Amino acid sequence: MKRFLIALTAVLFAMLPASAQSAKNSSADNIIGKYESVQGTDAYKVEVTKNADGTYKAQIYWMKDPIDPRTGKKALDVKNPDKSLRDRPCDQIVLIQNLKYIPAKKVWGDAKIYDPQRGIKANVTAHFLQDGRLSLKATVLGIGETVYWTPVKE
């Protein structure tokens, strides 16, 4: 009986991280907030907001290095495939538009994420990890890359 109780306790404790993860992923509006990401020497902050239609948008609002070293001026979105957006400052780029919550999978997706370094858009899905970070997986033609956004309090 003692072994059974120990095994049951171990199983219950093993399930705790999964339940904590699914709790954060179980409500669509949990994604709303501010996040930061560091990739190599690049660092930026993003704010996720809710659109009037119930979808979500992620927009850069801060960059570690907003100045283009070649020009000495604010860095612009020069690789954007939409030529009308190439004069937009990089610290104002909308990375994700119309992100939808998919309750059956407890993820956000059915949207594109924009990569300003490459000037491409990719399919994106997002979910919270056990440690609270937001995991965003972008895929183009089956090739994927994952970035992590850490929640910030300001």
Put a short name on every predicted segment.
Residues 131-133, 139-154:
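Edge beta-strand at a domain terminus
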Residues 32, 37-38, 43-117, 121-123, ...:
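Central antiparallel beta-sheet cores of small beta-barrel/beta-sandwich binding domains
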Residues 1-4:
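Positively charged n-region of N-terminal signal peptides that target proteins for export
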